[in-house]
């Protein structure tokens, strides 16, 4: 009898150990006591997306995080959202100037950084998507990026019982559909907020600029904030910033308007240290080279932004001080935040 009891107990222990060895690492929950609430930072504008119809919960956030890092969202199971949006680069991509998709394809635009998305009114360089919940679908179906269909993605997820359980935890039932997929990913991406840079600390009265940083800040306010408005450091507009003319028509690809040719969305200047290379096509490798473009490299065209018609006057000293200020916009805590790392 004792031997039979021992065998039963041993079998249970063995089964448990085998199960733990094969538990999907992506099922690791968000660490306990982790704050995933969405809070509007002091002195920031009201966000465009406030989770009113997509309540942010630990289960929804964990599901969205898993989906964000899951390569099964692509046709050949090789590319995830994180393949082009890595946390260490402020959710941009550093190893390719343009997006890298399935079958080693390269897109024609730089992967934009993903942070503070809840304040955005449109998405992608051309503003082709105007609601954050529709944003995750576009790269899934893009033939150069993930080249997958939504029915196939849903089928893959449904075939995984651990996903069915996570959808139940997040939404009440095991049903997996496109709307729930969208909402889960947005619970993760929408909660990615970067507001712990030195600039933010200065604005909150917890730090002070150096003399060069302060001088650079004054220059920024004089030369740059027309397009890169504080505190998000973008006004979300579309502008032609004088880059060399290519076949990419930018915003005009969406609107069909000749007046929008070669206009692209103004990016945020936060976290520039992590998000290089720069510009819509990833063609400029350094901040210094970006400033050189604005002082001496502007290409004239009919839709060039009026503020750049005469280029921007900056001395070498001005550039140095401006870069010192721009470096205060880097959020070193954000790129290490355990809430956003790959599970």
Say what each PLM segment does.
Residues 6, 21-343:
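Periplasmic c-type cytochrome electron-transfer domains
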């Amino acid at each position: 009898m004792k031997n039979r009891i021992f065998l039963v107990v041993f079998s249970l222990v063995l089964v448990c150990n085998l199960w733990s060895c094969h538990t999907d690492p992506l099922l690791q929950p968000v660490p306990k006591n982790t704050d995933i609430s969405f809070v509007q930072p002091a002195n920031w504008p009201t966000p465009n997306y406030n989770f009113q119809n997509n309540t942010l919960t630990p289960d929804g956030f964990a599901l969205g995080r898993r989906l964000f890092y899951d390569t099964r969202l692509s046709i050949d199971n090789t590319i995830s959202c994180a393949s082009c949006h890595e946390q260490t680069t402020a959710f941009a991509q550093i190893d390719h100037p343009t997006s890298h998709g399935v079958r080693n394809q390269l897109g024609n635009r730089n992967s934009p950084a993903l942070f503070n998305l809840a304040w955005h009114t449109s998405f992608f360089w051309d503003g082709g998507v105007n609601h954050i919940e529709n944003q995750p679908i576009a790269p899934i179906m893009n033939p150069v990026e993930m080249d997958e269909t939504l029915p196939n993605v849903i089928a893959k997820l449904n075939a995984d019982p651990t996903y069915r359980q996570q959808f139940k935890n997040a939404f009440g039932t095991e049903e997996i559909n496109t709307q729930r997929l969208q909402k889960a990913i947005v619970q993760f991406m929408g909660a990615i907020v970067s507001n712990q840079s030195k600039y933010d600390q200065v604005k909150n009265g917890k730090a002070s600029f150096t003399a060069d940083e302060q001088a650079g800040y004054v220059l920024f306010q004089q030369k740059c904030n027309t397009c890169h408005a504080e505190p998000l450091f973008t006004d979300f507009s579309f502008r032609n910033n004088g880059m060399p003319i290519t076949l990419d028509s930018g915003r005009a690809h969406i609107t069909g308007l000749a007046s929008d040719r070669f206009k692209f969305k103004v990016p945020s200047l936060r976290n520039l240290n992590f998000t290089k290379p720069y510009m819509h096509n990833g063609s400029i490798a350094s901040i210094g080279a970006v400033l050189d473009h604005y002082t001496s490299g502007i290409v004239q065209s009919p839709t060039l932004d009026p503020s750049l018609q005469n280029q921007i006057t900056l001395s070498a000293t001005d550039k140095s001080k401006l870069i010192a200020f721009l470096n205060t916009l880097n959020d070193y805590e954000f790129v290490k935040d355990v809430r956003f790392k790959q599970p």
